[in-house]
């Protein structure tokens, strides 16, 4: 019996060694695969490479070196000149996305009662199609976890649409929320609160800052709960978020006030001078940005009132008056009202 046990132990050890070797081999192959796609310029080491599809060349945008000639075009073999042509000729589905609970990998049955050729489904087959559509919806969301994730991601998309946020911000917010779900951070907290906190964190990560008041306005939870949940999630997920800079708010505020490009450039210049003298630290970034825009609009003869700037920035007129007086005094800016 002891001999049999010893043989079995040796066999188990050998099997573990084989598994370990296979695992190491797979990791090595994965690293080689990644190295194949992370190309850098052999001359200057830059990764800012541009693919010129007309000449079939891979060019470094920093030093101009042609790294590869006659590379293979991995795009479609067909040509399309508008959106309708692209939709007709495309033979693949939408790209994978984190903003859908199943990452967009499942299929769905269209609500229109038409076949693949665009012909109307006969009346005797509509009942069957209705049942197929119903079961397809049930299969896509099969358990409570998927149902909650689908609800949270739809809530994220609704808030992002209301704030006019871009696709990359939505994807980042969805990834943050999924990480929170994996770490079981949702327990004891509302789904809407965690979704709003994830969106706020994504805005800061993507340098498209939105204030807590703006997030709270489009969500169904209070500003206090969003702030508390955001601090908890960012701490547990170790999110590296830099403090928001007033400069990040300048383009959006100028766009809301219909100001010209020179006013925006002047506002950024004022804020950079203020940052050098540490006038922006310890103050709300929206108030400082609003004051810089107010000063820039006067200097560029494209004046806006304090009330107009305050409405767009979401601050009070008193805040703008206090901040612009500080900036004008410390930076020696002469303002003629």
Curated annotation (Swiss-Prot):
Q: Where are the zinc fingers (TFIIB-type)?
A: 37-68
An annotated Gene Ontology molecular function: DNA-binding transcription factor activity
InterPro entries reported for this sequence = Cyclin-like_dom, Cyclin-like_sf, TFIIB, TFIIB_arc, TFIIB_CS, TFIIB_cyclin, Znf_TFIIB
Which GO cellular component terms, listed alphabetically, does the Swiss-Prot or TrEMBL entry include?
Answer: transcription preinitiation complex
Source domain of life is: Archaea
Q: Write out the entry's keywords from A to Z.
A: Metal-binding, Repeat, Transcription, Transcription regulation, Zinc, Zinc-finger
Gene3D superfamilies in the record: 1.10.472.170, Cyclin-like
| Gene Ontology biological-process entries | transcription preinitiation complex assembly
SUPFAM superfamilies, sorted: Cyclin-like (SSF47954), Zinc beta-ribbon (SSF57783)
Annotated S-S bridges: none
Q: Does this entry carry the keyword Zinc-finger?
A: yes
Spans of sequence repeats, please give.
Answer: 154-237, 248-329
What family is this?
Belongs to the TFIIB family.
Q: Which NCBIfam families match?
A: PRK00423.1 (NF001658)
Q: What does this protein do?
A: Stabilizes TBP binding to an archaeal box-A promoter. Also responsible for recruiting RNA polymerase II to the pre-initiation complex (DNA-TBP-TFIIB).
This chain's protein is named Transcription initiation factor IIB
Q: Which organism is it from?
A: Methanothrix thermoacetophila (strain DSM 6194 / JCM 14653 / NBRC 101360 / PT) (Methanosaeta thermophila)
Gene name for this UniProt entry = tfb
């Amino acid at each position: 019996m002891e001999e049999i046990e010893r043989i079995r132990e040796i066999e188990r050890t050998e099997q573990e060694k084989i598994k370990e070797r296979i695992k190491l081999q797979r990791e090595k192959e994965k690293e080689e695969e990644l190295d194949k796609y992370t190309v850098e310029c052999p001359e200057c080491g830059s990764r800012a490479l541009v693919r010129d599809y007309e000449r079939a060349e891979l060019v470094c945008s920093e030093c101009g070196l042609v790294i590869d000639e006659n590379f293979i075009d991995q795009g479609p073999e067909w040509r399309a000149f508008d959106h309708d042509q692209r939709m007709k000729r495309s033979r693949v589905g939408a790209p994978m996305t984190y903003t859908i609970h199943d990452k967009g990998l499942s299929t769905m049955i269209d609500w229109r009662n038409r076949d693949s050729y665009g012909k109307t489904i006969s009346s005797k087959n509509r009942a069957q199609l209705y049942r197929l559509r119903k079961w397809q919806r049930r299969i896509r969301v099969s358990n409570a976890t998927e149902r909650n994730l689908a609800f949270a991601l739809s809530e994220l998309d609704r808030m992002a649409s209301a704030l006019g946020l871009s696709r990359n911000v939505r994807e980042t917010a969805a990834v943050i929320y999924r990480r929170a779900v994996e770490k079981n951070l949702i327990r004891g907290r509302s789904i809407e609160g965690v979704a709003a906190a994830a969106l706020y964190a994504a805005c800061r990560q993507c340098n498209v800052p939105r204030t807590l008041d703006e997030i709270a306005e489009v969500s169904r939870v209070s500003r206090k709960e969003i702030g508390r949940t955001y601090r908890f999630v960012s701490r547990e997920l170790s999110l590296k978020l830099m403090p928001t800079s007033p400069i990040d708010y300048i383009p959006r505020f100028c766009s809301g006030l219909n100001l010209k490009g020179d006013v925006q450039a002047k506002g950024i210049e004022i804020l950079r001078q203020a940052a050098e003298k540490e006038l922006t630290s310890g103050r709300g970034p929206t108030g400082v940005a609003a004051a810089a825009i107010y000063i820039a609009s006067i200097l560029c003869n494209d004046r806006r009132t304090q009330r107009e700037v305050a409405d767009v920035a979401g601050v009070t007129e008193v805040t703008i008056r206090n901040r612009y007086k500080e900036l004008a005094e410390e930076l020696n800016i002469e303002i003629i009202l």
